[in-house]
Design a protein with these regions (language model features):
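Active-site and adjacent loop segments of nucleotide-processing enzymes
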Residues: 168-274
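Polymerase palm active-site segment centered on the conserved acidic dipeptide of motif C
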Residues: 108-111, 118-211
Length: 274
């Protein structure tokens, strides 16, 4: 399965100096659409000689209601990834021949669960996704939604010009890929809009608590620390300087550490009494 983190998504966009587009789509009702019969057919094809393993997997899935994968299970998660790997390999297998030379139609793929992002030229992407939608439905029983998000990434020069306009007061941005909590563009990455609004609100309230109480309540500190990774892995230096993020993060870490120690002491005291 071609999983793709933030850095890999950036590389797909930035390493290609030519015109690059992206098509983002997802599978409709991914787990309920993946049948036990489909999974077993693929497993028999790939590991047909391993009879004990086939028997075990089939016995476990025999309890699944309606004969489809369960949502939230550990085994269904990996089995769905296994089925999706066939879709991704089929997408990457598309090639075209021009002047006797064969070339790839797809530049790269990023996949997160049932969300698929395909990179390449828009003319190639349209052909590949239409063919893949038909193949996935006929072969695997999966329905890829027809409502694709098409992103036309701006060039490096267009990004620089837009950056100058933003410094002059404009609030517009160039098109970006919104996936996994980030919006990725050729020259920078930011946090998704609604996630940023929630984070900024929590930061402001934490600063107010820090000024009034001298500490950040543990429950608010946990909420902030859960989004600390989004700040670290995005271009948020101006945000950190404006709102004194590093000071608040240090206070949040102390609060979370203190709360964890209190819980540990309670567990030890309860164990001693018992």
């Amino acid at each position: 399965l071609h999983l793709c983190d933030r850095r890999q998504r950036q590389m797909c966009i930035r390493d290609s100096h030519n015109k690059t587009d992206a098509a983002k789509c997802d599978v409709k009702k991914a787990y309920p659409s993946t049948t036990v019969e489909c999974v077993m057919n693929l497993l028999r094809r790939d590991i047909g000689k391993n009879k004990p393993l086939l028997w075990l997997v089939e016995a476990v899935m025999a309890n699944y209601p309606d004969g489809v994968l369960l949502i939230g299970g550990y085994l269904p998660c990996w089995l769905f990834n296994y089925v999706m790997s066939y879709v991704l390999r089929y997408i990457l297998s598309h090639r075209k021949v021009r002047r006797g030379k064969s070339s790839k139609m797809i530049l790269a793929i990023c996949c997160y669960a049932d969300d698929i992002t395909v990179y390449g030229r828009i003319s190639n992407l349209t052909k590949v996704m239409k063919d893949t939608t038909r193949w996935a439905k006929e072969t695997l029983g999966l329905t890829i939604k027809s409502a694709w998000d098409i992103i036309h990434f701006a060039s490096f020069d267009a990004e620089r010009q837009q950056n100058k306009r933003r410094k002059a007061g404009s609030h517009q941005r160039t098109p970006g890929l919104d996936m996994m909590g980030y919006v990725v563009r050729r020259t920078y990455t930011i946090i998704r809009g609604r996630n940023f609004v929630k984070l900024r609100r929590a930061i402001l309230r934490a600063q107010r608590d820090l000024d009034a109480l001298g500490y950040v309540p543990w429950w608010r500190a946990q909420r902030i620390m859960s989004q600390w990774g989004e700040i670290k892995h995005s271009d948020s230096r101006g945000f950190c300087q404006k709102y004194n993020i590093y000071k608040i993060i240090r206070a949040a870490k102390r609060s979370v550490s203190w709360h964890s120690k209190q819980l540990l002491l309670k567990e030890q005291a309860h164990g001693a009494v018992c």
